[in-house]
Amino acid sequence: MSEIWAIILAAGESKRMGFPKMLLPFRGMTIIEQVIENVINSQVEETVVVLGAISDEIRKVIGNWPVKHCYNEVYKEGMLSSVKCGFRFLPHDFEAALVFPGDQPLISPEITDKVISAFRLSGKGIIMPVYGNKRGHPLLISSRYREEVMLLDPGEGLRTLA
């Protein structure tokens, strides 16, 4: 059965703040939990959280949430390595995947649903929301682009597909 998946990127080292941003409090929970809650309250059917540098800490926080997780052994190679880890985790028959940064709790379920609707109505394989002439999140990638994602060089980003 084809499904819409979310890939939540939570493998980074959080060096800039000195403390993992995803574990900071936000609206009565942590930032990563708010991201998960927003995804769960959307039309997304399955979710995988990509873990890395602080996997033990994040796993403790998200343990009771109905999400799957995978571990990116090469998280130091950057965000694209985490995206690829998430895509490797997806079943072969998924319909599309939305890529979410694990530290952006303000991506509402409504925004996610609009991206999914645009995908289904347009027939396009890649959908990226734009706000104020700036590209945003979540980026939706159809299963037909799975191989292209897996072949991207580390220096390239997903935006090269869009």
Question: Positions of the model-derived regions?
Answer:
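Conserved N-terminal catalytic core of the sugar/cofactor nucleotidyltransferase
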Residues: E33-A96, A162
